[in-house]
Every structure is written in C-alpha cells, then in structure tokens.
Amino acid sequence: MVEKMNEQIYIIPLRDVKRSPRWKRSNTAMKDIRAFLAKHMKSEDVKLDASINEKVWERGSEKPPRKIRVRAMKFDDGQVQAELAQE
C-alpha cells in the first residue's frame, strides 16, 4: 500500500508561455507545469490529471491561462500526482 507523504497547493505562473510561438503555447504550458512540479516536489515522476489538461486547453492552443492552481500529492514511492485545485 502506498501512503500519501505530503500534499501542497501551488499557484503556477504561466506568463513565460507567452514567449513561445502562438500555436505552441498550450503545449509549452503543460511542459512548464510538469517542470514546476518536478522542481518543487523534488521528483521526476509527475502525473498530471485530465482536469489540468482540460483547463489549459479550454480556450485552444493559442490562449492558455496566465496562472493555474494545482493540488499536488507526493507519495512514498516518489510519484507526484497533480489535479486541478477546487476554488
């Protein structure tokens, strides 16, 4: 049985996404979210929930949100699972 180690809520800024080409912005945002969580949770094994994907791609490829609120849970085996935090 894998136990939950810790749980954090992060507000991830996505303003650097605006530097990438317009048609790549949502792809870049997903990569940035994964990299942010890997850095702050100190784990390379990051799984993103479908709710995060839906929120980023909600307005298409060219207009991702400026920031996103995420709940990340790190388990004893080092895996990080992230989902969209409820307001």
From Swiss-Prot:
Keywords: Ribonucleoprotein, Ribosomal protein. The keyword Ribosomal protein applies. GO terms for biological process: cytoplasmic translation. GO terms for cellular component: cytosolic large ribosomal subunit. SMART domains: Ribosomal_L31e (SM01380). InterPro entries: Ribosomal_eL31, Ribosomal_eL31_CS, Ribosomal_eL31_dom_sf. GO terms for molecular function: structural constituent of ribosome. Belongs to the eukaryotic ribosomal protein eL31 family. This is Large ribosomal subunit protein eL31. The lineage of its organism: Archaea, Methanobacteriati, Methanobacteriota, Stenosarchaea group, Methanomicrobia. The gene is rpl31e.
